[in-house]
From Swiss-Prot:
Location of the region described as Disordered in the Swiss-Prot/TrEMBL record: 1-112, 640-663, 878-905
Post-translational modification: Phosphorylated by ATR.
Crosslink site: Glycyl lysine isopeptide (Lys-Gly) (interchain with G-Cter in SUMO2): 85, 414, 442, 480, 507, 533, 535
Domain text: The RBM1 (RPA1-binding, also named RPA70N-binding) motif mediates interaction with RPA1. The RBM2 (RPA2-binding, also named RPA32C-binding) motif mediates interaction with RPA2. The ATR-activation domain (AAD) motif is required to bind and activate ATR.
Polar residues compositional bias, start-end: 640-653
InterPro entries from the UniProt entry: ETAA1
Compartment(s): Nucleus
Protein name, UniProt field: Ewing's tumor-associated antigen 1
Organism, scientific name: Homo sapiens (Human)
Length: 926
């Protein structure tokens, strides 16, 4: 290309056009001579060396062009200057197929000129029309340059082919091939040698395995005889397991004797397959995690390692080795594995007695599960189950110590549990992280399903051992089941001091299935007759100006925060480093684990089953609500506002009604396929389903005395959101709060009636039915995330301030107002501001049953349209009315509240977008 630029820039082609014309005329005649010159191209490299340099030849171009204008063609054609020029142009190109070389070779004055344009473009300038296509073709692609053969392959294949490799090279390549053959043959021989050696090693290992089996049989025989001689060494263990000491010795001592004798025999044997020290080190490494998780091992730990190392191929011996490790953590495992009769007696004895939950009621079944895992997997450690079994021991450490045992059998169990507490205390600090116990709910789910039917038989005392397990079952299903209450009954007569002082422990123990709570609650309920067994566990008093928790039992996934002045900091998760002797410390750890494990498993099948179960319950409750709605309203009218005794009678009647209805619905759903898994667990006392899908109709009366300064604050904070279908229900942390704030009304004896409690409410994918609301002359509002009928509107996260007016009759001393039901998710300050503006008595009715409004004195201006409706109002009409009331409220809101609402809407929108991404993620994640 540099030569071409020189020619382009040279003055010879551009000086005068007549020289170019003359050259063209010569080109039309001199074709034979030009071909002859091209045929001599084989000598171009030599000519290039002999010829003068390029600039000299360029200076010689004008005479050549001048000769073309003369009439002497032969001299023109045979002049060597022309040939030297052509040779010099092709001197730097060795390949005839090089396009750049061809362009440089065939360049002459007759070719079209190329004018350099900007940016690398070239423009051809055709000077004359005398050029023919054949001339151009002959110049560019002459025929004599074609190869003599028919195809390019003949240049390399055939007799006249160019030799690619000399004969010497071929000989060398053959020698190399022979070398490689020899190498491959030697490799095959080496592989055969290795295979033979491997076979020998395998045979030796088989022989060693047989010897190990013989040694094991021999040591087992000697260990059985050694039990009697070493009986004194096991006195301490026997005192801890004084129920069945022979079984304890039978499981512990054979391994002890086996370790001693097997080590001696293997050391004396002629063939040692493995390094004993190395094997002991490896076993120590692999058994280390089990030691850390399951507790401190016995004093024979090095011998146990030696036993495992010397019986590597003996799976039965290893199985017994694992049983020792498990027996250190779950001592009852020995009893359940060896004596099923003693196991059944341990399970049945606490049920027959009046004692509450003992540690043995859960541990035998847990140990059965793990023994089955060991026997079926053949020395495959189920690490997750070993980790999951730790919360059993942690939870059961302090339970028997909270109350005296009723029988000697329970005393034995108490001692065993004490042994577990000593074992676990040293290592449980390392296991306080909630992640270590996430497998607890999965294990408990199976255990509680086995003991679920035992609750129905167990109707003579308040808290059965299985009721605690059924509470744990709710953790696996992401629901908290209240097992011994049919409705929330607030009674002002029940020991205000006791309930106030113990409110923190009661709330906390409900969430953590503590036995202390059950003991205290049963003690509070023993003063009532057997007919009143169905009353709520939380017999709370709201007579004192103390903030109590109406939702006493929230979901395990939700944190029920109770604002109590006497409440300690025991409910804070940050107290992980407290004293282990504190009974509530283990409960706090388990509660933290449950809070982390409160989301559904990423399984669409469970969600579908839950939704189907919810639909079935809705159908059943709608049929029963229609029948009993009128009875409920009549029971409200019969309550005497000034009579405290009348309120008690009404409470008893309503509770009896509710218990009958709830038992019927619970039995129906308990027989269903999905009821046992996803819905709720009941206790045979006519236990209420506070956290279950539905509460039956009825009225619950509360006779309370409130002063002007008292305020009932009932917050429930939902920790984690739950996905219901594709729409988010609870996102982030939302306060589910029920406020009953007293305005400027001096009331000393205020009658509160809870009516029409048939409103299923969605809380963390489990429908929660709250009792209606208070018929007070004060602001009463129930904040609910979702009522089942309003799924569509609430699932889209619209800022709902819907009100549903229903039938309410109140005989208050001062004023009479009408109730409204709001479905909101607002901040507390916003609610209080609305409450201060509008002092409305609240009551909640069934959403799908027609609702009526009776007109009375002191009608609130916000409810004028609703008051005018004397007839029954359908759900759609009530929704329209609620939207109108919402618009009226929004008009009266201040700009600050409007701005706050906008911010909340923005937060909900962001939460919805985040939830949609989270909802789309499990499909790919699964």
């Amino acid at each position: 290309m540099s030569r071409r630029r020189k020619h382009d820039d040279s003055p010879s082609p551009k000086k005068t056009p007549h020289k170019t014309v003359a050259a063209e005329e010569c080109g039309s005649v001199v074709e034979p001579g030009r071909r002859r010159l091209r045929s001599a191209r084989g000598s171009w490299p030599c000519g290039a060396r002999e010829g003068p340099p390029g600039p000299v030849r360029q200076r010689e171009q004008p005479p050549t062009a001048a000769l073309c204008s003369k009439s002497n063609p032969e001299e023109r054609y045979e002049t060597p200057k022309r040939a030297l020029k052509m040779d010099s142009l092709s001197s730097s190109f060795s390949s005839p197929n090089d396009p750049d070389g061809q362009n440089d070779i065939f360049w002459d004055q007759n070719s079209p000129l190329t004018k350099q344009l900007g940016k690398g473009r070239k423009k051809q300038i055709y000077t004359t029309d005398s050029d023919e296509i054949s001339h151009i073709v002959n110049r560019i692609a002459p025929q004599d340059e074609k190869p003599t053969t028919n195809s390019m392959l003949d240049m390399w294949i055939g007799e006249t082919a160019i030799p690619c490799t000399p004969s010497v090279a071929k000989g060398k390549s053959r020698a190399k091939i022979s070398c490689t053959k020899l190498k491959t043959q030697s490799q095959e021989e080496e592989l055969m040698k290795l295979a033979k050696q491997f076979d020998k090693n395998m045979e030796e290992l088989d022989v060693i395995q047989e010897q190990n089996k013989r040694n094991y049989d021999f040591t087992q025989m000697i260990s059985e005889t050694e039990i009697l001689s070493n009986y004194k060494d096991n006195i301490q263990m026997w005192s801890l397991h004084n129920i069945v000491p022979e079984i304890d010795n039978a499981t512990k001592k054979p391994i002890k004797g086996n370790t001693k004798i097997s080590v001696a025999n293997n050391q004396n044997s002629s063939q040692k397959p493995f390094d004993q020290i190395a094997e002991a080190a490896f076993n120590a490494i692999f058994d280390g995690s089990t030691q850390k998780c399951s507790g401190q091992l016995s004093q024979e730990l090095p011998e146990a390692f030696w036993s495992t190392s010397n019986t590597t191929f003996v799976k039965t011996n290893a199985l017994k080795e694992e049983k020792i490790i498990t027996n250190e953590t779950l001592v009852i495992e020995k009893l359940s594995n060896k004596t099923p009769r003693s196991l059944s007696s341990q399970v049945d004895t606490p049920i027959m007695t009046k004692s509450c939950v003992t540690s043995c009621t859960k541990e035998p079944e847990t140990s059965n599960k793990y023994i089955d895992a060991f026997t079926t997997s053949d020395f495959e450690d189920d690490w997750e189950n070993l980790l999951g079994s730790e919360p059993f021991a942690m939870q059961n450490i302090d339970m028997p110590e909270l109350f005296p045992s009723k029988t000697a059998h329970v005393t034995d169990q108490k001692e065993i549990c004490t042994f577990n507490s000593k074992t676990v205390k040293n290592t449980s600090r390392a296991n306080t992280s909630p992640d270590a116990r996430l497998g607890d709910s999965k294990v408990l789910q199976d255990l509680s399903s086995k003991t679920y039917d035992r609750e129905l038989i167990d109707a003579e005392y308040r808290f059965s051992p299985n009721s605690n397990k059924s509470n744990k079952l709710s953790t696996g299903n992401k629901m908290k089941f209240e097992n011994s209450s049919n409705k929330i009954v607030i009674q002002d007569e029940i020991q205000n001091c006791i309930v106030t002082s113990n409110l923190t422990k009661i709330k906390e123990d409900i969430l953590t299935n503590s036995t202390e709570a059950s003991e205290r609650k049963s003690a509070l309920n023993t003063r009532y007759s057997n007919e009143q067994k169905n009353k709520c566990i939380l017999n709370q008093s709201i007579k004192a100006p103390v903030n109590t928790d109406l939702f006493g039992s929230a979901n395990l996934g939700s944190k029920t925060s109770v604002s109590n002045p006497n409440q300690t900091s025991a409910s804070k998760v940050g107290s992980f480093f407290d004293d282990w002797n504190d009974p509530s410390f283990a409960n706090e750890i388990i509660k933290a684990c449950h809070q982390l494990d409160n989301t559904w498993e990423a399984d669409d099948v469970d969600d579908d089953l839950l939704y189907q179960a919810c639909d079935d319950i809705e159908r059943l409750t709608q049929q029963q609500d229609i029948r009993k709605d009128s009875k409920t309203s009549e029971s409200i009218c019969e309550i005497n506002n000034n009579s405290e005794h009348g309120a008690k009678l009404t409470q008893q009647q309503d509770i009896r009604k509710d218990s009958k209805t709830s038992e019927s619905i619970c039995e129906i759903n308990n027989n269903s396929e999905h009821g046992a898994k996803n819905m709720f667990a009941i206790s045979k006392q006519g236990s209420n389903l506070v956290q279950s899908k539905h509460l039956n109709p009825g009225s619950i009366s509360v006779q309370t005395s409130l002063t002007n300064s008292s305020q009932i604050d009932k917050p429930m904070k939902m920790e984690k959101g739950e996905m219901y279908g594709n729409s988010p229900r609870f996102l982030g942390a939302t306060n589910l709060t029920m406020y009953s704030k007293i305005s400027n009304c001096q009331i000393n004896n205020l009658h509160v009636s809870y009516t029409n409690t048939d409103v299923p409410i969605q809380v963390n994918s489990s429908k929660l039915v709250l009792p209606g609301s208070s018929s007070l002359n004060v602001t009463s509002d129930h904040m609910n995330t979702e009522i089942t009928t309003y799924k569509k509107k609430l699932s889209t996260n619209q800022p709902c301030h819907k009100t549903v007016t229903d039938e309410a009759q109140s005989n208050l001393n001062t004023t009479v107002g009408f109730s409204k039901f709001t479905f909101t998710r607002m901040k507390n300050s916003q609610i209080l501001s609305q409450f201060n503006q509008n002092c409305i008595t609240g009551s909640m009715s069934d959403t799908k049953i027609t609702q009526g409004v009776e007109k009375k004195k002191g009608v609130n201006p916000l409810l004028e349209e609703a008051v005018g409706q004397q007839s029954l109002v359908k759900l759609s009409e009530s929704l329209k009315q609620s939207s109108k009331e919402e618009e009226e409220k929004n008009r009266k809101c201040s700009p600050e509240e409007i701005q706050r609402k906008r911010q909340e809407a923005l937060v909900r929108r962001m939460a919805k977008a985040r939830a949609s991404s989270v909802n789309a993620a499990p499909t790919s994640f699964l």
